[in-house]
Amino acid sequence: MERAIFAGGCFWCMVQPFEEQAGILSVRSGYTGGHLPNPSYEQVCAKTTGHTEAVEIIFDPEEISYKELVELYWVQTDPTDAFGQFEDRGDNYRPVIYYTTERQKEIAEQSKANLQASGRFDQPIVTTIEPAEPFYLAEDYHQGFYKKNPRRYAQSSAIRHQFLEENWS
């Protein structure tokens, strides 16, 4: 099994697209990239810990490759927005691909270069590619949020889905 970590704005919106793929064993919401051990949601939202909201994905590389996960990641995000994603603003919502191995780093960097070269976006691709840091599991009420709170999830993801439809379909 392998591990991937992606930050793409609110972690509520990043779970379902990955969870629906064959070869995914788990998708957990949490926090990474900051300086405070085991931060709370409130601390991360206060923008004082340096963490991003992210998802940790455990996957079977025999069924789905890391490259496929990176490609799926792109189409869940606005890779031209370094200051958050959609209605979620601030450093804690910035887009980041966290790599756990040098091979993951190479795959992510090549994928980013390919996306930039594709001309799909007029602006530069600003998603950063950074080494993975400790991943702290978010509180239980954040896990599987789209299943537990479908109406609130639909409301909170509406702007994202509109962008994805307009730019990735």
UniProtKB/Swiss-Prot annotation:
<feature type="active site">
    <location>
        <position position="10"/>
    </location>
</feature>
<comment type="similarity">
    <text>Belongs to the MsrA Met sulfoxide reductase family.</text>
</comment>
<protein>
    <recommendedName>
        <fullName>Peptide methionine sulfoxide reductase MsrA</fullName>
        <ecNumber>1.8.4.11</ecNumber>
    </recommendedName>
</protein>
<keyword id="KW-0560">Oxidoreductase</keyword>
<dbReference type="Pfam" id="PF01625">
    <property type="entry name" value="PMSR"/>
</dbReference>
<dbReference type="GO" id="GO:0008113">
    <property type="term" value="F:peptide-methionine (S)-S-oxide reductase activity"/>
</dbReference>
<comment type="function">
    <text>Has an important function as a repair enzyme for proteins that have been inactivated by oxidation. Catalyzes the reversible oxidation-reduction of methionine sulfoxide in proteins to methionine.</text>
</comment>
<dbReference type="GO" id="GO:0036211">
    <property type="term" value="P:protein modification process"/>
</dbReference>
<dbReference type="GO" id="GO:0033744">
    <property type="term" value="F:L-methionine:thioredoxin-disulfide S-oxidoreductase activity"/>
</dbReference>
<dbReference type="InterPro" id="IPR036509">
    <property type="entry name" value="Met_Sox_Rdtase_MsrA_sf"/>
</dbReference>
<dbReference type="InterPro" id="IPR002569">
    <property type="entry name" value="Met_Sox_Rdtase_MsrA_dom"/>
</dbReference>
